[in-house]
Structures are given as C-alpha cells and as structure tokens.
Amino acid sequence: MAGQKIRIRLKAYDHEVIDTSARKIVDTVTRTGAKVAGPVPLPTEKNVYCVIRSPHKYKDSREHFEMRTHKRLIDIIDPTPKTVDSLMRLDLPAGVDIEIKL
C-alpha cells in the first residue's frame, strides 16, 4: 500500500467522545508503524431550531434549541496491511460517525 493515503473523517455531537475516538485511532495507527497527520479540528456545525413555547397561541414567546456537530479529520500516510487490519478491529463508541476514504 505504498504511496496511498487513508482519510478518516469523524463526526459526533459530543466533543469529548470524538476526541477520545481520535486519540484511539492515532494510537492504533502509530503502533502499527504508519504516519499520522491530525486530528485536525474542522469547523463545528451549529443548527438552531426555534419552537413556540405554548401549544396554542402566544407566537411572540419562543424557545431556541441548538445542535452542534463536532468534526475531526485524520490522515494516515503510507498505511501497512497491519494498520488496516487493526483499524477494522478497533472498537469505537456508538455516538461517533466514521467516514473513510482511500
């Protein structure tokens, strides 16, 4: 797999969970002998939802809720077959969305 690069993009609502997952990935990759660039924090996506507080009237009284999506980017340079195998076996929390590109 010489000359290749694996790009891993992580998304989660909780920043602590995504940081521990990124740390696990970096530790696993460095143990297998590949080079790692990252984790690079990408801009946090913020969605704001506006809801009327009352079920019937009082349109002027509203409540705002927000949902933040934290993102990280990890590049693995010159991965070995052992690196790919260890990444496949890695156990990550359920709240983390993983996107892998070769």
Swiss-Prot record:
It holds the Pfam family Ribosomal_S10. Keywords: Ribonucleoprotein, Ribosomal protein. It comes from the Bacteria. Coiled coil: none annotated. GO terms for cellular component: ribonucleoprotein complex; ribosome. The keyword Transmembrane does not apply. InterPro entries: Ribosomal_uS10, Ribosomal_uS10_CS, Ribosomal_uS10_dom, Ribosomal_uS10_dom_sf. GO terms for molecular function: structural constituent of ribosome; tRNA binding. GO terms for biological process: translation. Belongs to the universal ribosomal protein uS10 family. Part of the 30S ribosomal subunit. Involved in the binding of tRNA to the ribosomes. This is Small ribosomal subunit protein uS10. The gene is rpsJ.
